[in-house]
């Protein structure tokens, strides 16, 4: 929980040791305790460009992420600092500072590419930090963005005729913020003042031409435009004279360039107000444990030589959470039944009604806590567990009723049995007295409350066990003629047969009630599942509509700039996306 976060400083989340990426268990432990949604801001850039200073400012501290004061890169791997979000109550701000790209000591671009890819996969806002202006050198240094399709997969197995276009990435890529440090130019174009955002848009314009040089110029710009439809730019003056840069974290704001101080404040304000909660496909809000799962899945994929895959990460997360959702739903069912049920219930229907209410709530708990339940395997598992729980309650109900009725019979009929043993009814007229007493005791038994569903069966079993005793009293009663005895025997047989028929009818009725309940359970599962699928479908369409709008904007820009070929490629992507949306709108839930 946010109130329980006490990270006084950053901690290494993903270690980079000798070119190998390893997850730090202590950092995962911190993430696992964060139950609120997280806003994840990652910063990436060349080493010694002041990334850590900005991250410390976002954390509200002067110190924390190592700034270093030499040309050596200080941050290795990816470091994490979790702080309560200053503008969004109930949210946690997770700051990720990455090791500097292009560190000559590493001599391994592979490593840089993975750090870059992980920062994109884990964040909801991706900050790219560089020095000076956006020139071709700055673009060349951002070559990692052109490699993303070779570093990240959105789907575990793309369709045969479907390349992973930017639509797949746009749906889960973070917003892009470019921070330009020690920016010394005047912000203007064609003699007119422009904003930092307009400067970024201007810098991302493409060159007409088909030469290799033109392609090299255009490729990173195209990738940024396609992968990151939402872009923002901030420029920063040099904070102090070069000689004082080494003491930057020790200096007070009044010792810094006022322009720089204001620019940093504007940057922090934007991040706090505009950075979104980390969200997965389908509108799934990421909290600490979910971020922990993503970190593990991605790093394990890279370590094993695979490409980190968004779909696989979500499915791995779904396996963990859906399994927990089943247990949570079952626990809720048990809690509700424990509170509501008093065994034995008077009728089976009473128990089944309580089961139905508790089951409905349990399904609601599962539906709220689950996602990406492929083939509804976990919901089927829940249905099976709830059915078993219901059967257990039915068995307990039966046993409780049997115990209660047996105890009642003992209390009510044991005095009669004692009288029989004493020979009180072994006399002329004794049989009629015995039958009268028996009827009185049966009436008393029937009047006892909460005997449960076994009341009749236990009574009839008891009476059947005493038939020989009843017959002995009948045969020894000398006041009855043989004919009367025969009639009485037939009457007892008829009464017993009638009771047996009644019991069979009751068993049949119980079976019918159980079958009706099973059908109602199935319909309840189906109803809630259908509603969830409709919500999921609406959410996905919403995401696709957002992606479509961004693609249409980009296509319009390409047309205005005169890039017909790129515009046609974008049109193909738009048509593919529109086709998927039509299919999703018309698909039926079976």
Swiss-Prot record:
Topology within the bilayer: Lipid-anchor
InterPro entries (UniProt xref): G_GB1_RHD3_dom (IPR030386), GBP_C (IPR037684), Guanylate-bd/ATL_C (IPR003191), Guanylate-bd_C_sf (IPR036543), Guanylate-bd_N (IPR015894), P-loop_NTPase (IPR027417)
PROSITE patterns with a match to the protein in the record: G_GB1_RHD3
Phosphothreonine carried by residues: 588
Assigned keywords, A-Z: Antibiotic, Antimicrobial, Antiviral defense, Cell membrane, Cytoplasm, Cytoplasmic vesicle, Golgi apparatus, GTP-binding, Hydrolase, Immunity, Innate immunity, Lipoprotein, Membrane, Methylation, Nucleotide-binding, Phosphoprotein, Prenylation, Secreted
Propiece residues: 588-590
Residue numbers of Phosphoserine PTMs: 156
Catalytic activity of the protein: GTP + H2O = GDP + phosphate + H(+); GDP + H2O = GMP + phosphate + H(+)
Keyword check for Phosphoprotein: yes
Domain GB1/RHD3-type G residue range list: 35-276
Enzyme class, first EC level, given as a word: hydrolase
UniProt-annotated stretches for the region GTPase domain (Globular): 1-309
Protein localization: Cytoplasmic vesicle membrane; Golgi apparatus membrane; Cell membrane; Cytoplasm, Cytosol
Keyword Glycoprotein in annotation: no
Catalytic activity, EC: 3.6.1.-, 3.6.5.-
Positions of modified residues (Cysteine methyl ester): 587
UniProt modification remark: Isoprenylation is required for proper subcellular location.
Job description of the protein: Interferon (IFN)-inducible GTPase that plays important roles in innate immunity against a diverse range of bacterial, viral and protozoan pathogens. Hydrolyzes GTP to GMP in two consecutive cleavage reactions: GTP is first hydrolyzed to GDP and then to GMP in a processive manner. Following infection, recruited to the pathogen-containing vacuoles or vacuole-escaped bacteria and promotes both inflammasome assembly and autophagy. Acts as a positive regulator of inflammasome assembly by facilitating the detection of inflammasome ligands from pathogens.
UniProt protein name: Guanylate-binding protein 1
Taxonomy of the source species: Eukaryota, Metazoa, Chordata, Craniata, Vertebrata
Gene: GBP1
């Amino acid at each position: 929980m946010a109130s329980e976060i006490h990270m006084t400083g950053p901690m290494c989340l993903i270690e980079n040791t000798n070119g190998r990426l390893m997850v730090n268990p202590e950092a995962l432990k911190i993430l696992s305790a964060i139950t609120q949604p997280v806003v994840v801001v990652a910063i990436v850039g060349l080493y010694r460009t002041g990334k850590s200073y900005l991250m410390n400012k976002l954390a509200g501290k002067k110190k924390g992420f190592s700034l270093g004061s030499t040309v050596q890169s200080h941050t290795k791997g990816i470091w994490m600092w979790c702080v309560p979000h200053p503008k969004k109550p109930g949210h946690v701000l997770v700051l990720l500072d990455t090791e500097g790209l292009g560190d000559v000591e590493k001599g391994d671009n592979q490593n840089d590419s993975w750090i870059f890819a992980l920062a994109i996969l884990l964040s909801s806002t991706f900050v790219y930090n560089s020095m000076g202006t956006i020139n071709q050198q700055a673009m060349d240094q951002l070559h990692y963005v052109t490699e993303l399709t070779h570093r990240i997969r959105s789907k575990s197995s793309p369709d045969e005729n479907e390349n992973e276009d930017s639509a797949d990435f746009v749906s889960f890529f973070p917003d892009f913020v470019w921070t330009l440090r020690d920016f010394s130019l005047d912000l203007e174009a064609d003699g007119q003042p422009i904003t930092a955002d307009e400067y970024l848009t201007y810098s991302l314009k493409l060159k007409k031409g088909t030469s290799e040089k033109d392609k090299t110029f255009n490729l990173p710009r195209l990738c940024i435009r396609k992968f990151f439809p939402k872009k923002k730019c901030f420029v920063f003056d040099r904070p102090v004279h070069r000689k004082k840069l080494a003491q930057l974290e020790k200096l007070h704001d009044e010792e810094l360039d006022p322009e720089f101080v204001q620019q940093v404040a504007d940057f922090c304000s934007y991040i706090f107000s505009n950075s979104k909660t980390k969200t997965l496909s389908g509108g799934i809000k990421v909290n600490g444990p979910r971020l922990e799962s993503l970190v593990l899945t991605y790093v394990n994929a890279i370590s094993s030589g695979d490409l980190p895959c968004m779909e696989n990460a979500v499915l791995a997360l779904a396996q963990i959470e859906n399994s927990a959702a089943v247990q949570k739903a079952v626990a809720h069912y048990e809690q509700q039944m424990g509170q509501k049920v008093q065994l034995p219930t008077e009728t089976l229907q009473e128990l089944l009604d309580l089961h139905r209410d508790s089951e409905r709530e349990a399904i609601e708990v599962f539906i709220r806590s689950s996602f990406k339940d492929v083939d509804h395997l976990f919901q089927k598992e829940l249905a099976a567990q709830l059915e078993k729980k219901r059967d257990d309650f039915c068995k307990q109900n039966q046993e409780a009723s049997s115990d209660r009725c047996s105890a009642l019979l003992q209390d009510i009929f044991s005095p009669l049995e004692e009288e029989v043993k004493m020979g009180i009814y072994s006399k002329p007229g004794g049989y009629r007295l015995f039958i009268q007493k028996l009827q009185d005791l049966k009436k008393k038994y029937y009047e006892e409350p909460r005997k449960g569903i076994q009341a009749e069966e236990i009574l009839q079993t008891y009476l059947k066990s005493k038939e020989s005793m009843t017959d002995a009293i009948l045969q020894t009663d000398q006041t009855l003629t043989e004919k009367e005895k025969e009639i009485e025997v037939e009457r007892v047989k008829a009464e017993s047969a009638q009771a047996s028929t009644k019991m069979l009818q009751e068993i049949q009725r119980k079976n019918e009630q159980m079958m009706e309940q099973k059908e109602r359970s199935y319909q309840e599962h189906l109803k809630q599942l259908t509603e969830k699928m409709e919500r999921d479908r609406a959410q996905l369409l919403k995401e696709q509509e957002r992606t479509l709008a961004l693609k249409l904007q980009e296509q319009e820009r390409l047309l205005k700039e005169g890039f017909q070929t790129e515009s046609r490629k974008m049109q193909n992507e738009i048509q593919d996306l529109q086709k998927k949306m039509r299919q999703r709108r018309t698909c039926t839930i079976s």
